């Protein structure tokens, strides 16, 4: 690959003692890197490893330059053609392919001594300087753009002023030449020299004008690219903030202790079984309540029959009352007429006995009706209390059943969501493990090759 020429193995590192940017503290670097889609810790920056620096710089190249493994797949495939076991050298080829874009990015950021040893053998000091350069470049590129526009405007104004001065001088010289031609004198040596200087200045002005046009075109292109990069960085920063909270929440399940995942699944299964048991018990209780309601309906029919019987007793009591009134009327008639015959006396005695029997019967009926009224009232009051209790209990059971069913559905949805999420996390962890194994194999191959 052509870009390997500028990273020799024995290249000496040079320190940029007069950097055009401030070196940021570690904590500020950790806060700024999520804007470049890089999630790091202070411990990783203070003790960097080759693998960590390579993955971080690859992510920075993807965020700022739009370079990733997919965009470089054709070139990497062409390099891997004809080699044995190309998959073992895939990361190494990707590492070398990123050197030229990273070198250009660091040079644009103000770091001119970047080389591949900064990835293979990283040091905390140089890593801090390089990350400070990239962060300052990404943070203050708009300020540099304004400074560039200001300098371009000043250059344009200066160029216009010089053009006007040269045009005025040219006009004066042209008039002087015409005057000399009119008087027929030979132009002196100064005039010839002045023409030569004017020609050189014209060529210089033309060159500056072309250069200014090129700078303006480049500025317009850079402005559009910078706007796209800024919008993409803002969007990615928002996504990283939301993902950072999600990763922190899932970290205890996937990274710290994978057994927590299995325990959580077992706990969810137990809770689902408990909810199933509660729902079954509630169903049985609802069935019992339905039976109680049916019994109460039967009792209502019995009460209706009792009320009909009470109505009949009332009608009979009214008939007896009419008979009593009739007997009383007859008694009064007998008293007024004064019948003295035995038949009248006997009839009176019979009527008196009938009256007494009717009165006793009426009294007994009234007593029975009073007792029946009291018993019916007590029974009705007791039934009303039972109905209220049954209605309240049934409403409570129905509410508990609905709540249990809703909670069970939520638990099933949460369990399905958590299961999918855990499976995705486990899949990512397996892929990361496979990638680490591949890198270890490459590393051992590289170490073996160097030892040989």
UniProtKB/Swiss-Prot annotation:
One of its GO terms (molecular function) is protein-containing complex binding. InterPro entries: Kinetochore_Nuf2_N, Nuf2_DHR10-like, Nuf2_N_sf. It is found in: Nucleus; Chromosome, Centromere, Kinetochore. Pfam families: Nuf2 (PF03800), Nuf2_DHR10-like (PF18595). GO terms for cellular component: Ndc80 complex; nucleus. One of its GO terms (biological process) is meiotic chromosome segregation. Gene3D superfamilies: Ncd80 complex, Nuf2 subunit (1.10.418.60). The keyword Coiled coil applies. The keyword DNA damage does not apply. Residues 152-280, 339-447 form a coiled coil. Keywords: Cell cycle, Cell division, Centromere, Chromosome, Coiled coil, Kinetochore, Mitosis, Nucleus. Component of the NDC80 complex, which consists of NDC80, NUF2, SPC24 and SPC25. Belongs to the NUF2 family. Acts as a component of the essential kinetochore-associated NDC80 complex, which is required for chromosome segregation and spindle checkpoint activity. This is Probable kinetochore protein NUF2. It comes from Yarrowia lipolytica (strain CLIB 122 / E 150) (Yeast). The lineage of its organism: Eukaryota, Fungi, Dikarya, Ascomycota, Saccharomycotina. The gene is NUF2.
